Amino acid sequence: MKNSIFKNKYNSTQYNLNSSVDIVLVGAGIMSVTLGSFLTILEPSWIIHIYERLNKPAQESSNSWNNAGTGHAAFCELNYTKYNKINDSIDITKALSINTAFELSLQFWAFLTKNGIINNPKSFINNIPHISFVWGQKNINFLKKRFQTLQTHNLFHGMIYSEDPHQIKSWIPLVMTGRNNNQKVAATYMPMGTDINFEEITTQLLAQLKKNPNFNIYLEHDVTHIERHNNKYWKISVQDIQHKKTIHTYTKYVFIGAGGKSLNLLQTANIQSVSGYAGFPVGGQFLVTYNPEIVSQHQAKVYGKANVSMPPMSVPHIDTRILNNKKVLLFGPFATFSSKFLKYGSWLDLFHSLNKHNLKPIIQAGIDNFPLIKYLFNQLIMSNHDRINALKEYYPEVNSKDWFLIQAGQRVQIIKKNNKNRGILQFGTEIVSSADGSLSALLGASPGASISVSITIKLLNIMFQNKYYNDLWKTKLIEIVPSYINPTLNNYHSDFMKQIRKNTRNILKLIYIEKENRSLIFKK
């Protein structure tokens, strides 16, 4: 076997690429770097490789401009709470699941901050109130019932509900100024909401990982093929873009955290569990303003309610973002379509993913999701005037001259067979693994980055079953993520968990509210 030894500008040491390593991580985004950070703590002697096809880490979905930066905790995202017509109730199961998963991320980041692994939490996470805002009596009734149901759980204590326009205007003056006085509105206000710069977290974690002599990251290295080798190792074929040659690495474990490209790479591995899976690529655009007079009037992430039968991605929101210590406002998203599976991918990505196993599921999912097809068509034909009119519902006094359009990231939604063997479109994220778990990938989209630690813990259990329950890993995991041992919903009512939540937020310099707030503020 011919060796290829060279020094990459992002590496601290020379390394023999045609060799055996403990784990290969594909993609240098928030997911791979989070898993790599856990493994460096749990198994510091393990040799870890990250391969990234671009010339810089965190430039796809983790890039600060390619996502909305919402710390998804189900405070304001109405699509995480469904109305049940049968018994006139609100199902908060998914909201609780998302919130508890986000708590794990906060605990991990607090551990990293406390131990000096990452610095200055204000550089990557800040309190920005999360607000749900609706109009129309039906939506107001829904929001009120949602608030009352969420208040039965202490994870949502601190939230305030109001139908008083004056109170709401004090929270979001930009949204309320110039609005029709006869329009009935309602809002919930959660001061514990956050804005997160996932690119900054990724960059800081990588800087720490590079200090480990057993860790190497190779930029401009495109993983093109994965196959089983001697029933023991995975053979990874990597295209060295800069030197225009292919090298091979043999590894015991593989995690594919390559965003939209994860599906294509899983298909090359020829594992049974990916049969029938397909991807539906959807891009996003946002209107942006830097105008300080406008930005100063808005200090919140305001989420509305999607129209009936519309997909979750259609939920409009106007957000404060803090990027490089500078505030900007974003409004959107506006959907785009491209056959690329990555923002910097190939137009052939979608076509390369098609095969005899997933063509039928794709067609079936398309037939069953006509509202999505209609939504995308309407989005694609939108003019800038149409987009400004959409923004006007959340900023009545908008001036189009203050806003410009940016292209955000590319997401690939999951299409797979259900228990009736029919193709369905699935929103969210999912781990797909080989039979023994040694090869695993993350498919899907939101709320991925916000719950990256919860996903990582699931990966540890799937990929390293022989180590996950041993005493050494247990001890370390409890130190890293204190609620790991028993992260059940009921446990969050305990004094122990309340103290963990309080300590976590103190370390991250975030607001913590323990007291329940059942007060409803109505229009006088």
Swiss-Prot record:
- Pathway this chain belongs to: Carbohydrate metabolism; tricarboxylic acid cycle; oxaloacetate from (S)-malate (quinone route): step 1/1
Per the record's keyword annotation, is rRNA processing included, yes or no? no
Q: Which EC main class describes this enzyme?
A: oxidoreductase
Q: What is catalysed by this protein?
A: (S)-malate + a quinone = a quinol + oxaloacetate
Which one Pfam family would you cite for this protein?
Mqo
Question: What keywords were assigned to this record?
Answer: FAD, Flavoprotein, Oxidoreductase, Tricarboxylic acid cycle
Q: Which GO terms describe its molecular function?
A: 2-hydroxyglutarate dehydrogenase activity; L-malate dehydrogenase (quinone) activity
Q: Which cofactor does it need?
A: FAD
Q: What is its EC number?
A: 1.1.5.4
Q: What is this protein called?
A: Probable malate:quinone oxidoreductase
